[in-house]
Amino acid sequence: MPYTDVMDRYRGLRAVSTHHHSAALGCLARQAILEQAKHLGLAYGQTLVAESEEEMTLLFDLAIYTAKRGRSRAIDRYAKSVMLQPGSDEALTLDAMCQARFSLWRIERRHETAGVIVADLLRDRETWLLDQGLAHSANPGMTVASRLCWPAEFAMTRGVIVPVYVELIEDAFSDSTAWLSHADPQRLADDPRFAAAIYRNAIQTGIMENVVYREPAVAD
């Protein structure tokens, strides 16, 4: 597929996913947001104390895509509340968002058409990732924590990209030993406490101060 066709497809799906993401926020109760904020150290009593949009992005990622055992996720509640045409971009994208995966991703190389090829370090597989900001700034060997979804033949981020390094990952593991019983790395990646620990340590180390999230431009 030519570059222009790929990017047009990406921008269209990105716009759809942004709409779904905003709508899913409406399925969140304030208490649920506050609980996640406490996990990240972004709450003082009943008050949110996030200092940047980037910190709020981490908070909303956890609030939308994770939930306590026995509770439903906001993204799933939203999906059940809407009627979409089967096979439409809206339906395909929402289904992909419901199946989004968190992991540690290493930039392997540039994709021949657009974006990059990344390796899932916890599931031992590669995928084609389209993200304009990351494609312009990432170098091979760089590792990021992110939640990806696959609405097409390529993956997209769910808005969160956290640069990680060995010390931050080690701190995340020492943050809690609750998931160390997971012998299977995939179960570790699927455990919402792992994402929370990565995000919490990213905030505490100040790494999020150097991260800016931007939606892709409508046209080059």
For each feature predicted by the language model, list its residue ranges.
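Short beta-alpha junctions and helix-cap segments that line functional grooves
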Residues: 130-132, 141
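Short aromatic-glycine-enriched beta-strand elements
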Residues: 114-118
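Mixed-charge, low-complexity intrinsically disordered regions
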Residues: 1-113, 125, 136-137, 143-220
